[in-house]
A protein has these predicted regions:
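Extended, low-complexity, intrinsically disordered C-terminal regulatory tails
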Residues: 31-68
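N-terminal post-signal-peptidase region of extra-cytosolic proteins
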Residues: 21-34
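Catalytic cores and adjacent binding grooves of peptidoglycan-active enzymes
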Residues: 71-72, 76-134
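A broad, low-specificity signal marking well-ordered, structured residues that form hydrophobic/aromatic
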Residues: 2, 44, 51, 81, ...
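Short, polar loop/linker segments at the starts of domains and inter-domain junctions
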Residues: 17-22, 69, 131-134
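N-terminal compositionally biased, intrinsically disordered segments and leader/signal-like regions
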Residues: 4-6, 46, 104
């Protein structure tokens, strides 16, 4: 299970002035929905691999230093999470189960753009597509 501590990655202590109540609220929703996704995945696949947060909340300096990060990344607002997925199994399962993403209220960055992790967010992208290209 992913916790808010996992999601903040110590950045809540390093950058307290950037962490607003809105970001905290968004982060709580993001973590809750990510845990629902992982619970569904584990229940249906019996995969027990421990999934860690590759990237959670990103303050501006962290986002600017993150390779290939969008200048207005949803991570900066607590609206997105990258979950470790070294073999791509979680991404593949998400691609095969868009109905579960929809039920939970998550949007998936296309796996071809996120090798080694699964990026999900709690708000739709500009395209509105459940699976999107950044």
């Amino acid at each position: 299970m992913i916790t808010l501590t996992d999601y903040f990655m110590g950045r809540d202590k390093q950058y307290p002035d950037e962490l607003t109540e809105e970001i905290r609220s968004n982060a709580a929703e993001t973590v809750a929905k990510a845990n629902l996704l992982l619970s569904s995945y584990r229940m249906l696949t019996k995969d027990e691999e421990i999934r860690k947060v590759n990237s959670g909340w990103r303050p501006a300096l962290i986002n600017a230093a993150t390779p290939n990060a969008a200048p207005r990344s949803k991570h900066m607002l607590g609206l997105a999470i990258d979950i470790s997925d070294p073999e791509g199994d979680l991404d593949e399962w998400c691609m095969d189960n868009p109905d579960i993403l929809q039920t939970i209220g998550l949007w998936l960055e296309h796996p071809s753009c996120s090798k080694g992790w699964t990026h999900v967010q709690i708000v739709p992208p500009k395209s509105g597509k459940r699976v999107f290209y950044p």
